[in-house]
Each structure stands twice: as structure tokens, then as C-alpha cells.
Amino acid sequence: MLMLFFCVTLIRVSAQTIIGATINSYWPVISVDVCNNRVALPAIVVGVNIGDKMLLMQMQGAIIDTSDTPAYGTILDYNGAGNYELLTVANVTNNIITFQEAIMRTYHAAGKVQVVLVPQYNDVIVASTLTAQPWNGSSGGVIAFIASGTVTLNADIDATGTGFRGGAVFHDSFCYAGGLGYDGYRCNTVLSGGANKGEGIAGTLYQNLGRGAPANGGGGGNDSNTGGGGGANILTGGNGGTRSNLSPGCAGDNPGIGGHSLAVSNVDNRAFLGGGGGAGDDNSNGATAGANGGGIIIIRANSIVSNGYTLISRGADVVTTASFDGGGGGGGGGMICLDAPD
């Protein structure tokens, strides 16, 4: 009698998820109820479920010196800007999201608070460039995900230029005050003495023109024809260029000042978008806008295999050459936060 024996080998295949493009969803927050661990959004929430992970983040709200002096833009109080924490969704009702954990940090809704849906994976492969929805003034600018296993890069994770926005071009009069030039640090469109400042953690201010740097945003170039200052993050931004053909009849030696550096430490544990560059001064329709800053990348994983690919969060460059007017400042670099033992 022929006896046949069959051996069956059980192979466990862990789920590998292929990702690329944009994986996060973003919502601005209109109020934070710390006592009840919940936030309110502007509209009914769709696409968020119990057990989902979300980042609660305050993007702006810093208080700065607004005097028309060299101290302009110095940070007096971060006022919650940069605070963030990872939370688990306990309940979703209409426009209210309640979290399982207590909200531990302070958030001011006026400081542009957002929640970011954070996907959770086992093993994950980045097959095409992974990026963020650019910051739009109320949400965006963040790439974040969790992997219980290995993250394999077959493409870059790139948040370049998705941070705070560069200053837009503002057309002012030629040769301020009869050619004396404007040497102030902040002004409005009525005074019209300089270009728009770049955006930073202090938000957009009423007197948003002129060379003073608002926190990590770059200052706008002053009349006449000076360049905008570069945005900043941990390091200070660079100053803009002066007018190349200075003359007694039309000054131009007060360029935009580079953004102020931000205080970052393991104790504070803050995360910031890169500051936007200031615009160049424009009176002949040839200036260029400031460039956007870099975004934030947050990854928690067991291990990351790079395969020669990179995680990038540079400030954007100003790619257009100014003509007869000031050039915009480049964006400040963003921030990359990793929790990966291997």
C-alpha cells in the first residue's frame, strides 16, 4: 500500500501598503475644549473614525514686538505656537471630535490650530514622492504617519515649499518721499513704503509691509528696489539685497531682514513650518514674490530603509529673476521629526 504524506507550510505575509502623493487630511479648528478633550471644526466631519490617530497642532499665534524699531519681530511669547500632540479619536459627532486621551498642552484657536489625520500602517512602501497639502493659511503643511513595521523608501518624502507662504508682490510708488527711501520696519498699504513680509508663526499683521521680519517670516524689501529677507526656522534667515544703482535721487539701502530663529529643544518639543520669504520691492512691475517655507514631516516607525532616497523639507527657492525691481527672499527650511529605533 502506498502511503502519501503531505506537509503543509504556513507562511504569514504581513500587509504591505503602497503610498505616495498626499496621504493626510487636514481640518482647521475653531475651538479647543481642554476640559472635555475635544475640538470643534467649522463643518460636519467626514472621513474620521473611532480609533483613528490625529495630530492636534497650533501653527501660529506668537506675540512679537511690533514697534517701528530694530526690535520689530522679536518673539515675546510663543503663546502656544508650535504645540502639538498625537491623540486617538474616541467619538465623532457632527463637527465635534472627542479624544480618548487628555489634551495636555495649551492651544489658542486664533493661532490657527488644525487637526491632521495620521494614517496607521504595518509595513509601508513609499512608491512615489510623498508630499503634503501646502499650508493655505488655516491648514496643511504636514506629512505624518505611523508604521508598526518597516518604512521602505522607493521615492522621497518631500515637504519642500509646503510651509508658511512667501510675501506677495505689492506695487508701490517710485522713490519714496522724493527719493529719500523708506527706512521703517513696518507700514501699511497707505504709507506704501515697502513690500509684503513673509508669513511666520506670528501670522499676518495689519502693518504687513516693510523690512522688519515678523518672527520667522522674512521682511519685505523697502523702497526702492531692495530684496526681501529669507524665511527662517531654527536658523536665522538671510537679509535681502540692496539696490544696485544707489543714487542721491533714489535711495535703496534698506532691504528686507531675514526671519528670526525659533527656539527648539527636546524639552519644549515644538514643531514649526519654515517661514516664508519677504517680497522684493516693486515699482516697475518687475519684482518677485517671496518663496514658501518648508513643511513638517513626522514619522513614527519601527525602522526606516532609505534605499538612497531622502526625507526633505527645504524652503522653496525664488525661481524667477527680478527685472528692474527687488527679488523675493527664499523660504526657510521646515522640520523633520522621527521616532524610529532602526
Predicted region positions:
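Glycine-centric low-complexity/flexibility signal
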Residues: 123, 130-337
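Acidic glycine-/aspartate-rich tracts in secreted/extracellular proteins
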Residues: 59-63, 93-95, 102-105, 150, ...
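Short, intrinsically disordered, charge-balanced linker/junction segments flanking boundaries
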Residues: 14, 340-342
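Extended Gly/Ser/Thr-rich low-complexity repeat segments
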Residues: 47-60, 105-123, 155-156
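Short coil-to-beta-strand transition motifs
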Residues: 77-86, 117-123, 153
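Bacterial Sec-dependent N-terminal signal peptides
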Residues: 1-17
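Ligand-binding face of N-terminal immunoglobulin V-set domains in extracellular IgSF glycoproteins
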Residues: 72-73, 81-82, 87, 105-106, ...
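Autoprocessing Asn-cyclization modules and mimics
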Residues: 16-84, 92-100, 129-140
